[in-house]
């Protein structure tokens, strides 16, 4: 298998990823700004499929209408020249001080209305550029103190905002769905919808739940100490994995945004195994930050590494699944039984079945052959580490 990416792999990057200048809470920028047109050109040369953006990544905040059209025109020309696509777009409702208390859930009603209009304007551009997914990350939706926000009212306002956006895209006839991106801990101390589970539960309360899914990010779930592949499995099970952000994270700490494959390599292996075996057809979107120690050569090397690592893990996962010894271990672990309904014969038959309880020999069941999970896991490790042919 070749580890050289092609557009068929559907690898995408945000303008804000390779374009991150290295500025953080403790230090100024270490790289100059990167022209979005150059980003499109360089990513195309590396074999990427598409590029994504916040409105303010492409069009500097406060631009006039004339300036806005000029930025869009240059960007569109770069897309046309390279064949790159825009599968997803999103709105920046977190950088400008006006959003210091949030966008959709700010206590200030005027700010909430502005946030909706800002989002709607970029939805129009996203649809114009062919995007099929619109991501919503509520980075400022939350609080640092208990009395600052009535969470029930805030969730009402969040619901109101998404219902209005759903109404808008439906009225416009846009072929566009929303993907809510959960994240805990930062930049607000307590953010609303911090995990995949929170977002999935929230979606079921919306007026058009079919329009809404999730955009989980590797590091975000791991910041909460959760198993990312398990979260993705639940999103797939719910039919709500509309988009995914791939990066690396080393445990429960700040959002590191390492290149994909760095950090928790085992979780990355199981994630790729799941996405490929489940037939996920969406973009493999990298939301990472090249370390501030890197120059632009390092930026592009980091982007290339994201794609290469995914392809290596894809090859290793496929070899793992095709290995006869692995298949035997899977049968011994009785995963085929887990896929069988527990009571396909129905409740009445279950209650009438004495072997299910009254005559069930718990000692005999406990004494059955052990579950060879360690053997199965070591086989996975062998494949991951390249110790099997």
Curated annotation (Swiss-Prot):
GO terms for cellular component: cytoplasm. GO terms for molecular function: magnesium ion binding; xylose isomerase activity. Transmembrane segments: none annotated. Mg(2+) 2 binds at residues 217, 220, 255, 257. Involved in D-xylose catabolism. Belongs to the xylose isomerase family. PANTHER family: PTHR48408, XYLOSE ISOMERASE. This is Xylose isomerase. It comes from Streptomyces violaceusniger. The gene is xylA.
């Amino acid at each position: 298998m070749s580890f050289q990416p092609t557009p068929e792999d559907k690898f995408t990057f945000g303008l804000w990823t390779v374009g991150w200048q290295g500025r953080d809470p403790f230090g100024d920028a270490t790289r100059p700004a990167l022209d979005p047109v150059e980003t499109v050109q360089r990513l195309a040369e590396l074999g990427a499929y598409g590029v994504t953006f916040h409105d303010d990544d492409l069009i500097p905040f406060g631009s006039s209408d004339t300036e806005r059209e000029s930025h869009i025109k240059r960007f569109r020309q770069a897309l046309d020249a390279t064949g790159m696509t825009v599968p997803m777009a999103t709105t920046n409702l977190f950088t400008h001080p006006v959003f210091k208390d949030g966008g959709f859930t700010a206590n200030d009603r005027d700010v909430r209305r502005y946030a909706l209009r800002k989002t709607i304007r970029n939805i129009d551009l996203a649809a114009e550029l062919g995007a099929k997914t619109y991501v919503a990350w509520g980075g400022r939706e939350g609080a640092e103190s208990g009395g600052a926000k009535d969470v029930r009212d805030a969730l009402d306002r969040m619901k109101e905002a998404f219902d209005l956006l759903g109404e808008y895209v439906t009225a416009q006839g846009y072929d566009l769905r929303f993907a809510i991106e959960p994240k805990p801990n930062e930049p607000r101390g307590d953010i609303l919808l911090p995990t995949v589970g929170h977002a999935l539960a929230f979606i079921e309360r919306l007026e058009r739940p079919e329009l809404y899914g999730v955009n989980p990010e590797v590091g975000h779930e791991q910041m909460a100490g959760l198993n990312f592949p398990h979260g993705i499995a639940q999103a797939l099970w719910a039919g709500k994995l509309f988009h995914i952000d791939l990066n690396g994270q080393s445990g429960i700490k700040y959002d590191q945004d390492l290149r994909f494959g760095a950090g928790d390599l085992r979780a990355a292996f199981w994630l790729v195994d799941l996405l490929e075996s489940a037939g996920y057809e969406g973009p493999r979107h990298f939301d990472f930050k090249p370390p501030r120690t890197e120059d632009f050569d390092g930026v592009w090397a980091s982007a290339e590494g994201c794609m290469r690592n995914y392809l290596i893990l894809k090859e290793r996962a496929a070899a793992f699944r095709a290995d006869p010894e692995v298949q035997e271990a899977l049968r011994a672990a009785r995963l085929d039984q887990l896929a069988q309904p527990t009571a396909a014969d129905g409740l009445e038959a279950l209650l009438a079945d004495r072997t299910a309880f009254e005559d069930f020999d718990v000692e005999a069941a406990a004494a059955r052959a052990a579950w060879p999970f360690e053997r199965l896991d070591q086989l996975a490790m062998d494949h991951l580490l390249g110790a099997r042919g």
